């Protein structure tokens, strides 16, 4: 979605940046993993198809995609190379986080997805922070079109299910035919306060008009 095409969101542990062409090669390499494709319900693509995906997502008015950077790793790489570079950006990539708007009859429903592709970056709270930040972004900047969030998680992925439940997502119904559990978060004042998004000093949005 073009609305986030020049937006960088900085948190305590992660930095969210728009999915650009420079990120495609590493993203494509992640998706060569059968495990990751299974977890994300993704098809195996050629690198040319992945470039087409990136361009399509950029133009899609119903999808917001951010690449997740490990903030400490980025700062470490910048220190080693005496400043910021595209190479440091790529080295610090650990996954992605998305909001989808186009799949539901219920207007205002947005589906969240998060992937931590780098095994060494898992179980460190990075996915949780990325989800909190993108939800805060949605509540702050997309409040007119985002009334509630949902996630679909494989029933065997208990760590992810428990993470979302701890963020005040509630299970809706039982396991579906795809062996997925549906969880929902209503954008009410109490829920937003529980996430502590409004008063989070580690959350800020920066706009870079010509960021590449």
From Swiss-Prot:
Stored Pfam families: Acetyltransf_3
Keywords: Acyltransferase, Transferase
GO molecular function (one): N-acetyltransferase activity
Record has Acyltransferase as a keyword: yes
Entries under SUPFAM superfamilies matching the protein: Acyl-CoA N-acyltransferases (Nat)
InterPro entries: Acyl_CoA_acyltransferase, GNAT_dom, NAT9-like
EC number: 2.3.1.-
Domain (N-acetyltransferase): residue spans on this chain: 34-201
Family: Belongs to the acetyltransferase family. GNAT subfamily.
Name under which the protein is recorded: N-acetyltransferase 9-like protein
Gene field: nat9
């Amino acid at each position: 979605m073009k609305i986030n095409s020049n937006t960088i969101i900085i948190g305590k542990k992660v930095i969210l940046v728009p999915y650009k062409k420079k990120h495609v090669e590493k993203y494509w390499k992640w998706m060569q993993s059968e495990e990751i494709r299974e977890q994300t319900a993704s098809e195996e693509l050629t690198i040319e198809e992945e470039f087409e995906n990136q361009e399509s997502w950029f133009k899609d008015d119903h999808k917001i995609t951010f690449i997740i950077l490990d903030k400490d790793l980025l700062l470490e790489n910048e220190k080693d190379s005496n400043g910021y570079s595209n190479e440091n950006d790529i080295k610090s990539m650990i996954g992605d986080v998305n909001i989808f708007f186009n799949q539901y009859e219920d207007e205002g429903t947005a589906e969240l997805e998060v992937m931590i592709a780098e095994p060494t970056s898992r179980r460190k709270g990075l996915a949780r922070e990325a989800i909190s930040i993108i939800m805060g972004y949605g509540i702050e900047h997309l409040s007119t079109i985002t009334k509630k969030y949902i996630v679909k998680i494989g029933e065997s992925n208990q760590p992810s299910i428990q993470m979302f439940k701890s963020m005040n997502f509630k299970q809706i119904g039982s396991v579906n035919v795809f062996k997925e559990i549906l969880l929902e978060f209503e954008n009410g004042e109490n829920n937003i306060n529980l996430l502590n998004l409004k008063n989070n000093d580690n959350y800020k949005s920066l706009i870079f008009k010509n960021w590449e």
